[in-house]
Amino acid sequence: LNKEELVHILSARTLDGTIPGLYQALQNGHAQAIKSYGNLVLDTIDKNIDLEYLISAFKYETHSSNKYTPGLFSAFQNGHADAIKAYCGVLGNSNLTRGEIIRMLEARNYDGAPGLLLAYQNGDINTIQSFFDSLIMLDISKDFIEELLTAKHYDFTG
């Protein structure tokens, strides 16, 4: 297999190419699958651009590559605290830059809404606490923790 074929296989996207397997695991709260997938990808892929593509787990809206939702966003939406913790563990074990990790932790959808905002709206204390604990585990600076926990909605739609 060449690198492109391997990345395609590891993305485990649906037949129409819009939904990656990791997105589905995050959406459905399959923490062990997230850990196992993360280990497989981290052991197999060495280029950050491919790693970021695979771990970001963007679901693209049908017929629009401009509209996407990260898997972590769906985990927040559905209150999957263990899945969020597992995902953060994968990020912590990766060689992604601090900036790349923070961008993924924001979990913003195509219109700028951060995933954590949904946990706040749902009053999901367990998910919020799990995310906070994960930020500490990832050794994220206090300033970035404050920014992430503020969960500001930036309107990207213009």
Regions found by a protein language model. Give the residues of each.
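Ankyrin repeat domain, specifically the short helix-to-loop turn at the C-terminus of the second helix
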Residues: L1-I9, S36-S56, A86-M104, Q129-L148
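Start-of-repeat signature of ankyrin repeats
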Residues: G17-T18, K67-Y68, G112, D155-F156
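Low-complexity/repetitive intrinsically disordered segments
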Residues: L1-L15, Q27-H30, L148-T150, Y154-G158
